Amino acid sequence: MSNTSWIERYVMPAALKIAGQKHVLSVRDGIILNMPFMLIGSFFLIFAYLPIPGYADMMSGLFGEVWRDKMLYPVKATYDIMALISSFGIAYRLAEKYRTIDPLSAGAMSLVAFVMTIPQNTLFTPVHGAAEVIKGVIPVSMVGSQGLFVAIVISLLSTEIYRLVASRNLVIRMPDGVPPAVAKSFLALIPGFCVLAVVLALRLAVEASPFGDINSMIATLIGIPMHHVGGTLPGMIISVIVIGILWTLGLHGDAIVLVFIQPVWLSNMSENLTAFQNGQPIPHIITQQFYDLWIAPGGTGALLGLVIFMLLRSRSQQMKQLGKIAAPGALFNISEPMVFGIPLVMNPYFFLPFILTPVLLVIVSYTAMATGLVAPPAGIALPFTTPIFISGYLATGGHISGIVLQVVNLTISLVVYYPFFRAWDRLKAKEEHASAQPQESVILPDADRA
């Protein structure tokens, strides 16, 4: 039995049941609301970090030294409010599926509840002064990708509370003459009060704990253990597994995990650069470039192989069009259009290859470099947007072996993703074919037409 047949017979039926669950669908559909904004932001990100010699100097000469900061304005405006958009979108989609509560009211209430979980203060330390707490501000990190997991939980919780209260008829109904928009607002009063009361209790409970706030609790529970495993092969494997799992749950795995192990990687990179400049053996394999350029071709999950199949082998028009949209980003190692476009978030079909592929690439790449078959990263800092093959050559200090390893890794990505891509593509093609079939019309008797 082929791999594809095995997947279609055993994996797909279970995946269909999971994927059809209301809450799973709502999370996926709600997060997709970010996609057009992130696509726009990704193009500006590419232009800000084009890996062309002399490009940065040219732009500085034309637009000034701060040109890149200004180019990143759209990136910050699109990427940094992901959790806000998702909190509204998930609740809206879940309310749509229940059909018993107003989706717009549910989305707005979820947004309010999510904002209420965020501490509205931040610690500010002047250059020549003492640290002080600034009140009345919302940290951008809390409403961006780092707050996405909290947004998912709160949006599902608030909508379920809203539905439960409304189903008990604990609502204020206005007379028939009141405009519908006003009537819906009053219907949301009591359910909304209950939602905020529960979320307030949750926030107070977490604030009474050593964590202080919900986002800090997640960062502490996940991040501190990762700090102790930074530069080892087992630690690297654990890191990419955790990153992948978090992404499939809708949480920005890189933003959470890398913030704790990046200091180790950057320190290794600095030591590698010193050794490279002095003509000494490179001491470390695992650095920031090792992860960015060999483990994540096409972005987190090594999605470049999947994008290639979508461009060249898709029978589904949806997959083919998404491949065309995601290809420029994948070429520059930006995976968000794929993660939120297919989507890979809460998608059991792609859970296994999304986790397995980076693990295999870590093992293969580490072994190749440890045995001397491939030159390790020389400590040369390259932006993560540097395209494959160019990056392999530059990061190793001009060794062809870096390119060869990237070819091998891309091949592994193609092999692992292929059966899952084929099964998903067949499913989407069948759905498109079914939706294209003419619907049977029902001819009513003359008496029923009046």
Describe these PLM feature segments.
Residues 34-49, 85-93, 109-121, 150-163, ...:
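Hydrophobic core segments of alpha-helical transmembrane domains in multi-pass membrane transport
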Residues 103, 121-234:
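Membrane-interface helix-loop-helix junctions at boundaries between adjacent transmembrane segments
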Residues 48-51, 55-56, 94-102, 165-174, ...:
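Membrane-interfacial segments
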Residues 84-94, 108, 112, 278-349, ...:
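Alpha-helical membrane segments and immediately flanking helix-loop junctions
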Residues 2-18, 53, 57-69, 273-282, ...:
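Transmembrane alpha-helical segments and their short flanking loops
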